Amino acid sequence: MILMPKKKVKKFRGSRTFGWGSHKNRRGRGNRGGAGNAGVHKHKYIKFVKLAKKGEYLFGKHGFTRPKILRKDYLNVQAVKETLRWLKEEGKLDDYTYRYLYSRPELNAGDLDEIIDRLASLGLAEKEGDVYRIDLAELGYSKLLGSGKVTRKMEVKVFEATPKAVEKIEAAGGKVVAE
Protein backbone atom coordinates (compact mmCIF):
# COMPACT_ATOMS: atom_id res chain seq x y z
CA MET A 1 0.00 0.00 0.00
CA ILE A 2 1.24 3.46 -0.96
CA LEU A 3 1.12 6.15 1.72
CA MET A 4 0.09 9.70 0.90
CA PRO A 5 2.81 12.26 1.59
CA LYS A 6 2.29 14.48 4.64
CA LYS A 7 0.53 17.74 3.83
CA LYS A 8 2.64 20.89 4.03
CA VAL A 9 -0.36 23.13 4.76
CA LYS A 10 -1.77 22.71 8.20
CA LYS A 11 -5.20 24.26 8.38
CA PHE A 12 -5.56 24.24 12.17
CA ARG A 13 -9.15 23.11 12.05
CA GLY A 14 -10.72 23.57 15.48
CA SER A 15 -8.22 26.22 16.52
CA ARG A 16 -9.41 29.73 17.23
CA THR A 17 -6.34 31.66 16.10
CA PHE A 18 -4.88 29.27 13.50
CA GLY A 19 -1.32 29.50 14.76
CA TRP A 20 -1.03 33.30 14.95
CA GLY A 21 -1.16 33.72 18.72
CA SER A 22 -3.85 36.35 19.02
CA HIS A 23 -6.64 37.45 16.74
CA LYS A 24 -5.09 40.94 16.73
CA ASN A 25 -1.86 39.70 15.18
CA ARG A 26 -3.38 38.95 11.73
CA ARG A 27 -4.80 42.39 11.07
CA GLY A 28 -1.97 43.84 9.00
CA ARG A 29 -0.49 46.27 11.52
CA GLY A 30 2.11 44.07 13.10
CA ASN A 31 2.75 43.27 16.73
CA ARG A 32 3.09 46.79 18.05
CA GLY A 33 2.36 46.39 21.73
CA GLY A 34 -0.46 48.90 21.76
CA ALA A 35 -1.36 52.10 19.97
CA GLY A 36 0.20 55.51 20.57
CA ASN A 37 1.73 56.03 23.98
CA ALA A 38 0.39 52.77 25.39
CA GLY A 39 2.93 51.11 27.65
CA VAL A 40 5.47 53.93 27.85
CA HIS A 41 5.95 53.29 31.55
CA LYS A 42 5.99 49.51 31.07
CA HIS A 43 7.11 47.54 28.03
CA LYS A 44 7.93 50.64 25.93
CA TYR A 45 9.98 52.38 28.62
CA ILE A 46 12.87 53.12 26.23
CA LYS A 47 10.50 55.10 24.00
CA PHE A 48 9.56 57.20 27.04
CA VAL A 49 13.22 57.81 27.93
CA LYS A 50 14.08 58.93 24.38
CA LEU A 51 11.07 61.25 24.08
CA ALA A 52 11.59 62.70 27.56
CA LYS A 53 15.21 63.63 26.71
CA LYS A 54 13.97 65.60 23.70
CA GLY A 55 11.20 67.16 25.77
CA GLU A 56 8.55 65.69 23.48
CA TYR A 57 6.76 63.56 26.05
CA LEU A 58 4.47 64.95 28.72
CA PHE A 59 2.80 62.53 31.08
CA GLY A 60 -0.24 63.42 33.15
CA LYS A 61 -2.37 66.52 33.26
CA HIS A 62 -0.92 69.93 32.45
CA GLY A 63 -2.29 73.43 32.60
CA PHE A 64 -5.62 74.92 33.45
CA THR A 65 -8.64 75.81 31.31
CA ARG A 66 -10.54 78.76 32.65
CA PRO A 67 -14.32 78.25 32.66
CA LYS A 68 -15.99 80.15 29.81
CA ILE A 69 -18.23 82.30 32.02
CA LEU A 70 -15.16 83.65 33.81
CA ARG A 71 -13.52 84.44 30.49
CA LYS A 72 -16.51 86.59 29.56
CA ASP A 73 -16.33 88.45 32.89
CA TYR A 74 -12.58 88.90 32.43
CA LEU A 75 -13.14 90.41 28.98
CA ASN A 76 -15.72 92.81 30.44
CA VAL A 77 -13.23 93.91 33.11
CA GLN A 78 -10.56 94.42 30.45
CA ALA A 79 -12.97 96.57 28.41
CA VAL A 80 -13.74 98.74 31.47
CA LYS A 81 -10.04 99.19 32.20
CA GLU A 82 -9.27 100.10 28.58
CA THR A 83 -12.07 102.69 28.57
CA LEU A 84 -10.80 104.20 31.83
CA ARG A 85 -7.24 104.32 30.46
CA TRP A 86 -8.47 106.07 27.33
CA LEU A 87 -10.46 108.62 29.39
CA LYS A 88 -7.36 109.32 31.50
CA GLU A 89 -5.19 109.82 28.40
CA GLU A 90 -7.80 112.19 26.95
CA GLY A 91 -7.64 114.20 30.18
CA LYS A 92 -11.23 113.47 31.17
CA LEU A 93 -10.28 111.64 34.39
CA ASP A 94 -7.98 112.89 37.14
CA ASP A 95 -5.62 110.51 38.97
CA TYR A 96 -7.82 109.98 42.02
CA THR A 97 -10.97 109.16 40.04
CA TYR A 98 -9.00 106.95 37.66
CA ARG A 99 -7.48 104.92 40.51
CA TYR A 100 -10.84 104.76 42.30
CA LEU A 101 -12.69 103.38 39.27
CA TYR A 102 -9.77 101.24 38.01
CA SER A 103 -9.75 99.32 41.30
CA ARG A 104 -13.44 98.45 40.87
CA PRO A 105 -14.20 96.04 38.02
CA GLU A 106 -17.90 96.38 38.84
CA LEU A 107 -19.63 99.56 39.99
CA ASN A 108 -21.89 99.64 43.03
CA ALA A 109 -24.57 102.26 43.65
CA GLY A 110 -22.71 103.33 46.82
CA ASP A 111 -19.45 103.81 44.89
CA LEU A 112 -21.27 105.91 42.30
CA ASP A 113 -22.81 108.02 45.07
CA GLU A 114 -19.35 108.70 46.53
CA ILE A 115 -17.75 109.76 43.27
CA ILE A 116 -20.62 111.46 41.39
CA ASP A 117 -19.43 114.98 42.38
CA ARG A 118 -15.99 114.37 40.88
CA LEU A 119 -17.51 112.91 37.71
CA ALA A 120 -19.74 116.00 37.37
CA SER A 121 -16.75 118.33 37.79
CA LEU A 122 -14.85 116.37 35.11
CA GLY A 123 -17.77 116.57 32.68
CA LEU A 124 -18.64 112.86 32.73
CA ALA A 125 -21.92 113.55 34.58
CA GLU A 126 -24.37 116.45 34.43
CA LYS A 127 -25.94 118.21 37.39
CA GLU A 128 -29.33 119.88 36.91
CA GLY A 129 -30.59 121.31 40.18
CA ASP A 130 -30.07 118.56 42.73
CA VAL A 131 -30.29 115.69 40.20
CA TYR A 132 -27.17 114.11 38.68
CA ARG A 133 -27.42 112.51 35.22
CA ILE A 134 -24.81 109.95 34.17
CA ASP A 135 -24.37 107.41 31.38
CA LEU A 136 -22.30 104.53 32.74
CA ALA A 137 -21.62 103.20 29.24
CA GLU A 138 -19.28 106.20 28.75
CA LEU A 139 -17.18 104.88 31.64
CA GLY A 140 -17.29 101.34 30.21
CA TYR A 141 -19.63 99.85 32.82
CA SER A 142 -22.56 97.74 31.62
CA LYS A 143 -24.06 96.76 34.99
CA LEU A 144 -24.82 98.63 38.22
CA LEU A 145 -24.77 96.63 41.45
CA GLY A 146 -26.66 97.46 44.64
CA SER A 147 -24.09 97.60 47.44
CA GLY A 148 -23.53 100.76 49.53
CA LYS A 149 -25.59 103.80 50.59
CA VAL A 150 -27.20 106.18 48.12
CA THR A 151 -27.86 109.73 49.40
CA ARG A 152 -28.03 111.81 46.19
CA LYS A 153 -30.69 111.96 43.49
CA MET A 154 -29.28 110.34 40.37
CA GLU A 155 -30.63 109.51 36.95
CA VAL A 156 -28.44 106.63 35.82
CA LYS A 157 -28.43 105.34 32.26
CA VAL A 158 -27.03 101.82 32.20
CA PHE A 159 -27.48 98.61 30.21
CA GLU A 160 -28.41 96.50 33.25
CA ALA A 161 -28.95 97.10 36.99
CA THR A 162 -29.72 94.76 39.87
CA PRO A 163 -33.12 95.12 41.58
CA LYS A 164 -31.40 96.23 44.79
CA ALA A 165 -29.53 99.03 42.96
CA VAL A 166 -32.77 100.24 41.33
CA GLU A 167 -34.54 100.16 44.71
CA LYS A 168 -31.81 102.20 46.46
CA ILE A 169 -31.56 104.85 43.73
CA GLU A 170 -35.35 105.25 43.56
CA ALA A 171 -35.53 105.48 47.39
CA ALA A 172 -33.11 108.44 47.20
CA GLY A 173 -35.37 110.17 44.65
CA GLY A 174 -33.59 109.16 41.45
CA LYS A 175 -34.28 106.70 38.67
CA VAL A 176 -32.51 104.07 36.60
CA VAL A 177 -32.95 104.06 32.83
CA ALA A 178 -32.12 100.62 31.43
CA GLU A 179 -31.12 100.62 27.75
From Swiss-Prot:
GO terms for molecular function: rRNA binding; structural constituent of ribosome. It comes from the Archaea. SUPFAM superfamilies: Ribosomal proteins L15p and L18e. The keyword DNA-binding does not apply. Keywords: Ribonucleoprotein, Ribosomal protein, RNA-binding, rRNA-binding. One of its GO terms (biological process) is translation. GO terms for cellular component: cytosolic large ribosomal subunit. The keyword Cell cycle does not apply. PANTHER family: 60S RIBOSOMAL PROTEIN L27A, LARGE RIBOSOMAL SUBUNIT PROTEIN UL15. Part of the 50S ribosomal subunit. Binds to the 23S rRNA. Belongs to the universal ribosomal protein uL15 family. This is Large ribosomal subunit protein uL15.
